[in-house]
Amino acid sequence: MQDSLTLNPIARVDGTLNLPGSKSVSNRALLLAAQANGTTRLTNLLDSDDVRHMLTALGQLGVNYRLSADRRSCEIDGLGGPLRADEALTLFLGNAGTAMRPLAAALCLQAQDVTLTGEPRMKERPIGHLVDALRQGGAQIDYLEHEHYPPLRLRGGYQGGDITVDGSVSSQFLTALLMMAPLAPQNSCIRIKGELVSRPYIDITLALMKSFGIEVRHDNYQVFYLTGGSVYRSPGEYLVEGDASSASYFLAAAAIRGGTVRVTGIGRHSVQGDIRFADVLESMGATIRWGNDYIECSRASLHTIDMDMNHIPDAAMTIATTALFASGGTTTLRNIANWRVKETDRLTAMATELRKVGATVIEGEDYLTVTPSARLSAARIGTYNDHRMAMCFALVALSDTPVTILDPQCTHKTFPDFFARLSALSTPASPHSAP
C-alpha cells in the first residue's frame, strides 16, 4: 500500500473530465432499486468503497444483482417490498454513512435480528437522532457499545405514525426515514426539530423517490407526509449523475491554474446541491459556463469571500483550500458545524493541515477563517482516512510548492483514480518556471 504521494508543482490545468457517478445518488438508487417492483438497470454507478459496502450488504440480504465488469452498471432485481433477512446476521459497512443510516431505517421493517457495524471511525459518528425517531415509530433498536453510536442491533417493529427528528446534525437521518416510511404499514408524518442542515441532500432523496414512483408532500421542509403500504416501482433504467462534490476539485483547479476545465455528467439541471459550488467560485472571481450536461470553469484572479456554506458542506472543503490562492485577506466559511460529524472532524483537520502549508487559520465552533501566506510551504498532509482531505489538499500543488499527501488510498471511498485524473489534466511546472 502506498504510504504517501508527492505532487510536484503544476503550471496549468486544462481539458475535459467525465465525472464518476455520485456517491449520494448511487447508494440511494441501489437501496430503492432493491426494494422496488421490477428490475432496474443503474448506469454510471460509482465504483468506490462506500458503494461496495452497500452492494455487499444488499447481497447478504438476498437481493440479486448483476454488476458489469467495470462495476459502472448494475442490474438489480427488486424485492417489491422492504428488505428482509432470513436469519440473524451482521452487516459490516466500513465508514459508509450513506449505507449505515438508510439501512438502519430500512431494516426496521423486518423481524430478524440484524447488527450493523463498521470501522472504528463509524463507531464515532452519531446516529442517536435517527434511532430516537425510529423508536417513536415502534422500532426495536439496541446500542451494542456506546449510547447514540453504532454498532446497532435492529429487531424490526417500525409501524409509522407521528415522528419528530432532529435535523441539525445530519440530513442523512431524514433521508433514511423518508426512503423507508412509504414501505411501513401505517402512514408517517415526519416533523423536523431544529434547523435542517444540508437541505439540498434532501432534494436528492425526494428526486430519487419520485423516479421510483413515490412523491412526497411536505410543508416547506418542516413536515413531511408519507403514505404507508406503498410500493416503489422500478423506472427500468436510471442514469446516476456525475458526482458534484468530486467536480469541485477540478473546477477549483481551473480557477486557480486554468486554462479551462469542463466537467461532464452534471449540469444546470442536476439534482445535487453541490453544483452550487460553481456559484461560489464565480463569486470569488472565476468564469463559469453552464450546459445541460457540463459545467466549465476558466481561470481568473480570485478574491476572498465571507459566506454561509451549510448548503454545500462537502464541496465547501474545496473552498477552504482554494482560499490559499485568493487575494485580499481572509476567507470565512460559516455555518459548517456538521463538518465535525463527517469521515473525521473536518473543521479541526482542515485547520491543522492549512496551518502546515503556511495559512493563518481560526477554527470556530461552526466557522473557519483562512488567511493565506505570501508563499505556501511544502508539507506532509495528514488525511485522517478522509477522502476529501486528500483531494482538497492536492490543490496545493497548483502553487510553486510541492505537497505530499499521506495515505492517498483514502480517495478510494469515492474517487479511486482521482490522482491519475488530475495528472491527466495537468502540465507540470518546469524547475525554473515562474509561479
Curated annotation (Swiss-Prot):
Active site residues per record: 314
Cysteine pairings via disulfide bonds: none
Major localization listed first in the record, in broad terms: cytoplasm
Group of enzyme by EC: transferase
Listed InterPro entries: Enolpyruvate_Tfrase_dom, Enolpyruvate_Tfrase_sf, EPSP_synthase, EPSP_synthase_CS, RNA3'P_cycl/enolpyr_Trfase_a/b
Any single biological process term in GO: amino acid biosynthetic process
One Gene Ontology cellular component: cytoplasm
Family recorded in the similarity comment: Belongs to the EPSP synthase family.
Described purpose of this protein according to its UniProt entry: Catalyzes the transfer of the enolpyruvyl moiety of phosphoenolpyruvate (PEP) to the 5-hydroxyl of shikimate-3-phosphate (S3P) to produce enolpyruvyl shikimate-3-phosphate and inorganic phosphate.
Name this polypeptide is given: 3-phosphoshikimate 1-carboxyvinyltransferase
